[in-house]
Each structure stands twice: as structure tokens, then as C-alpha cells.
Amino acid sequence: MRLRYDKNAEGKLEMFNYLIKQGDSKILLDDKTVLEIGMGKGEMIVELAKAHPELNFIGLEKYPTVAAKCIKKANEYNLSNFKILIDDAFKVDEIFEGQCKVIWLTFSDPWPKARHEKRRLTHPLFLEKYRKILDKDGILKFKSDNDGLYEFSLSSLQNSNWRIIDHGIDLHNSKYNENNYQTGYERKWSARGKKINYIFAQKGE
């Protein structure tokens, strides 16, 4: 179901002090920062922020109407380590400086048509941007219900000199499920019997 546009969404995020307002300088990342690119309604990142108060979490989302859906839960948890930035993922290396601990790509748009390949968040163009803002020991974490995007992402990472730590086609029956926090899409598709693909990778030399 398509969300109804909320013209006040960005104002709500700012009112509750979740919104990062960009100035002329870049936003600083460090080894205590976890970044989710395309956070959607923020179901996963909000739970992660609650579970890990020692870390700082930033959700990057293009659409304020979607991002604002996380406010109720974030307020309920009284989170002080969670912020949102409204911007386009393609500008990620222009927005941030420094290097973060983790980059999450969760249930990204698969852009299935060949002519849209460069829009996929695991295309080599994006991987080169992530390389600039991920710590040398940092991890890129990917999960998706889309098998085609999973196969594309695995190939793209390998061909772009990223080291695959682990990957698989059934996250919920893996050793990682115990510490897995689900997104809305994840709950929806796994409830219908769809297995969830995952990839964990580090940048190569």
C-alpha cells in the first residue's frame, strides 16, 4: 500500500530532534557509527539503536514521509543515539566524511530492468562510494528477499574487490538469526514463506 504524502513529515522529524540538518560541512562518521542506507520506515535501525546504546545510528532515507513512520517507536524507546538524514544515496560520499563501523543495505529496490542496473545500491558505482566511508575493519551488511538482487550483489562485490565474509539464502535459519532485527518487508515476505538472502562483506585492499 502506497503511503499518503505527508507535507509535514520533515518538520515532525525535526521537532523530535531526529533530523540531521545539513550545513556546508560534511557529517562526521567514526568507528562507533552504524549507517543504514535506504532505511525506509526504520523498523530495524530503531531496534538496533535500542539494543546498542554504545553505538550511534544514522538512517539515510530519500523520502521524509516514509522516514517519519519511525517516530512513534523511537519516541517510545527514548532514543538519543539515532538520527535521520533525508537525502539521496548516490550522494553518500559527498554527505559524509570519516569512516563508519557498519553499512546496512536492507531490502533495497532491486531495479530489475537492465537499463536501471546503475541504480541498484550494490552496483560498483555505489560500492566505490561505500569504500570511502567504511572503516578498514568495517562490514557491509546486505539482506533482501529478491533473489536476483542477491546474485547481482554477490557478483558485484566480488568483481569490485570486496571480501565476502559470509553469504546465504536463508538468514532466518542461519547462525546470524539470533541477533537479527527484522524490517517490515522482512516480516512480510518471511511470513509468506520467502527465504531471506544475506551477504556480509569487507572492502579489499
From Swiss-Prot:
GO terms for molecular function: tRNA (guanine(46)-N7)-methyltransferase activity. Residues 115-120 are annotated as: Interaction with RNA. Pathway: tRNA modification; N(7)-methylguanine-tRNA biosynthesis. Substrate binds at residues 113, 145, 183-186. Its EC number is 2.1.1.33. Keywords: Methyltransferase, S-adenosyl-L-methionine, Transferase, tRNA processing. The keyword Transferase applies. The keyword Transmembrane does not apply. It catalyses: guanosine(46) in tRNA + S-adenosyl-L-methionine = N(7)-methylguanosine(46) in tRNA + S-adenosyl-L-homocysteine. Catalyzes the formation of N(7)-methylguanine at position 46 (m7G46) in tRNA. HAMAP family: tRNA_methyltr_TrmB. Belongs to the class I-like SAM-binding methyltransferase superfamily. TrmB family. This is tRNA (guanine-N(7)-)-methyltransferase. It comes from Mycoplasmopsis agalactiae (strain NCTC 10123 / CIP 59.7 / PG2).
